[in-house]
């Protein structure tokens, strides 16, 4: 019997709160690049372990650090003077039953491939130096297969949190960044780099979006063209946000620009990310497991990306909580808002947490007696099927930042 608790949440629903703040760091933000590399390295190791040994061996690659380089951007195209440095650290199994695997090679290859696929104007070979300092360990397949068929044991006493549904402001912030970094948008507007941050503020029924967007200098010939691209970004963000809300909207882009000065100062880059000059990055310093930073909502400080997907509850429980929450609001009639908290106990099976709690706000006309059993059933089903979280992670089907 699992310890599942369902209780009412005595809190003003998010849409009725007077002030709401939401942030998303886009895929080209240095912190997000760190998250993306960490997760891609973990996924590459998982698949390499499965191919070679038939099982995922222990590893954690969640300690990626980016040290910014130096660049000289200018209209029409500048240059990278000093490449950014990317340090891969953590721990991984490099030898199983006397058979070695190229852990460093796999990690470096995965990191570079991630950069090529996601930072389109970055020359990975000349503008980034990737160094692997992942600690090497050895493993025994007999121990791994002896545990097969049983739930993994929690590696820590930790917790995960999630909530659903997204508010209007949360959806707008997420969709705005997703639009600006979509392949379709990049084809139409190559001057828009990947280092994008969207900050949303809702004051009652007034939503203000502040967008920071690194422009790629080679696609912008002068100040006039830069301002044209800024206007496109503003208009497209306004357009997609308008489809998601009837509230009043205002959109600002690159508010630190100084265009009227004798020597204009604007946000242009050589590569599309501020990591090329002055902006460092670290895993876990940006978006939470659901892709947003939401001070109005419950959040865990745990970094999700790069942690092993087998028994690292700091990763699994945060992702599981969000899956649970989404299923509850979708399938349980009468639930207006739900917060999920799951707590592990070190050394105990991860499918039997110390406590799994759902706090719910109901629609008018519904009672806790009507929803408690259904909510508990959704949570129990997800805990029973917890290996599916691992499977989705290995296949790259779950976003971790």
UniProtKB/Swiss-Prot annotation:
UniProtKB keywords: ATP-binding, Magnesium, Nucleotide-binding, One-carbon metabolism, Transferase
Domain of life: Archaea
Binding, ATP: 135-140
Catalytic reactions on record: L-methionine + ATP + H2O = S-adenosyl-L-methionine + phosphate + diphosphate
Cited Pfam families: AdoMet_Synthase (PF01941)
Pathway where it operates: Amino-acid biosynthesis; S-adenosyl-L-methionine biosynthesis; S-adenosyl-L-methionine from L-methionine: step 1/1
Record EC number: 2.5.1.6
Entry's Gene Ontology BP terms: one-carbon metabolic process; S-adenosylmethionine biosynthetic process
A single MF term (Gene Ontology): methionine adenosyltransferase activity
Known cofactor(s): Mg(2+)
Role played: Catalyzes the formation of S-adenosylmethionine from methionine and ATP.
The family this protein is said to belong to: Belongs to the AdoMet synthase 2 family.
Protein name, per record: S-adenosylmethionine synthase
Organism (species): Methanothermobacter thermautotrophicus (strain ATCC 29096 / DSM 1053 / JCM 10044 / NBRC 100330 / Delta H) (Methanobacterium thermoautotrophicum)
């Amino acid at each position: 019997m699992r310890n599942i608790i369902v209780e009412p949440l005595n809190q003003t629903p998010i849409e009725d709160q007077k002030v709401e703040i939401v942030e998303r760091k886009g895929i080209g933000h240095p912190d997000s690049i760190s998250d993306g590399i960490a997760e891609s390295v973990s996924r590459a190791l998982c698949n390499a372990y499965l191919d070679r040994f038939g099982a995922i061996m222990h590893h954690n690659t969640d300690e990626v650090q980016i040290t910014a380089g130096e660049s000289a951007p200018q209209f029409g195209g500048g240059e990278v003077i000093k490449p950014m440095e990317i340090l891969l650290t953590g721990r991984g199994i490099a030898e199983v039953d006397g058979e070695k695997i190229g852990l460093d090679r796999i990690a470096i290859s995965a990191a570079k491939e991630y950069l090529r696929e996601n930072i389109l104007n970055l020359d990975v070979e000349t503008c980034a130096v990737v160094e692997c300092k992942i600690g090497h360990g050895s493993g025994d397949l007999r121990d791994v297969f002896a545990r097969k068929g049983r739930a993994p044991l929690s590696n820590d006493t930790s917790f995960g949190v999630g909530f659903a549904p997204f508010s209007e402001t949360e959806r707008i912030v997420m969709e705005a960044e997703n639009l600006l970094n979509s392949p379709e948008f990049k084809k139409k507007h190559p001057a828009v780099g990947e280092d994008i941050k969207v900050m949303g503020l809702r004051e009652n029924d007034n939503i203000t979006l502040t967008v920071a967007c690194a422009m790629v200098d080679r696609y912008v010939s002068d100040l006039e063209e830069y301002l044209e691209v800024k206007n496109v970004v503003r208009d497209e963000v306004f357009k997609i946000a308008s489809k998601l809300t009837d509230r009043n909207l205002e959109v600002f882009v690159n508010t630190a620009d100084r265009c009227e000065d004798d020597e204009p100062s604007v946000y242009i880059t050589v590569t599309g990310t501020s990591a090329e000059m002055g902006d460092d990055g670290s895993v876990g310093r940006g978006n939470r497991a659901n892709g947003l930073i939401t001070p109005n909502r419950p959040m865990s400080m745990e970094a999700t990306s790069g942690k092993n997907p087998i028994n690292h509850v700091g990763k699994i429980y945060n992702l599981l909580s969000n899956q649970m929450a989404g299923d509850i609001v979708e399938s349980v009639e009468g639930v207006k808002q739900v917060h999920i908290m799951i707590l592990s106990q070190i050394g105990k099976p991860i499918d039997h947490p110390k406590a799994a709690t759902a706090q719910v706000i109901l629609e008018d006309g519904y009672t806790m007696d009507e929803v408690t059993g259904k909510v508990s059933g959704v949570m129990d089903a997800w805990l029973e099927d917890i290996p599916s979280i691992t499977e989705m992670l290995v296949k790259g089907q779950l976003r971790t930042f």
